[in-house]
């Protein structure tokens, strides 16, 4: 197998294993949903090279942001709070990309529930990733 064939095979496998689309200009999106109990507000703060500010979600509400991967790195670090006086907290990398492999149309879904933060790319059932501290 020549080098070009090997390269194309590796690229094809990377695309096939990714949840990204083949639309080359489609932005990546990070979604947040509050599935918390009644009267429990979710506070979200995400940063990368930019500060995306604070967002407050009531149960059932959503917040999302979209972006193109950077050739250098595309990292979005997020902090979430909930409960009385926002005493329960979780912090995590909500999106990591860019660099060697640039994603197009990748989707990360985060769902805040009473027992923690659940994650899915949208194709599978959400799984508990982080517990509240």
Curated annotation (Swiss-Prot):
Compartments where located: Secreted
GO cellular component labels: extracellular region
Pfam families named in the record: Self-incomp_S1
Keyword Secreted: yes
Signal peptide: 1-20
Membrane-spanning residues: none
Family annotation (InterPro entries): Self-incomp_S1
Keyword annotations from UniProtKB, A to Z: Secreted, Self-incompatibility, Signal
Single Gene Ontology BP annotation: rejection of self pollen
UniProt record similarity statement: Belongs to the plant self-incompatibility (S1) protein family.
PANTHER family: PTHR31232, S-PROTEIN HOMOLOG 9 (PTHR31232:SF135)
Protein name: S-protein homolog 9
Source species: Arabidopsis thaliana (Mouse-ear cress)
Lineage of producing organism: Eukaryota, Viridiplantae, Streptophyta, Embryophyta, Tracheophyta
